[in-house]
Amino acid sequence: DDFLSSIMPPQFEARMHGLWVRAQYKMGRWLQAQILLSFIMALIVGIGLWILGVKYAFLIAIIVGILEIVPYVGPIVSGGLATLLALSQSTVLGLWTLIFFIVAQQMESHILIPLLIKKLVGLNPVAVILAMLVGAKLGGILGILLAVPIAAGIDELFDDLANRKSI
């Protein structure tokens, strides 16, 4: 807040402060969505692997929940770990585990993420997918991580400009 005051001309200070507060709120909601997504995916994986009969299903689910925060890499690592553990039990179980993770990942990417971001952050699901694609192209994994919060801030800025919001 003090930083904004020091760089903003006085006539824009109130408007920029309001924009900053709203953008921070959306970013907080994005973090809530990420935590909820981690919990949901851990639950889905735990139940799915338990049904399949994979040993240590719930330990793997905890790992999935933790690694879920790292886009693309986290699910690949946790899915690979689960598949290897299942392969140590049987080849067929390893194959079913791999199929399960692919389906779960597709469901997450195409349904869960867009819906949670729409509900909690207020961004259009298409905008979320586009932001993540652009983020991946520009910044790799870090770009994907920052894509939705940046898109939320930009959305708030455009909303502010379109509606001429004040505090």
Residue ranges and their predicted role:
Residues 94-167:
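Hydrophobic alpha-helical transmembrane segments of membrane transport and translocation systems
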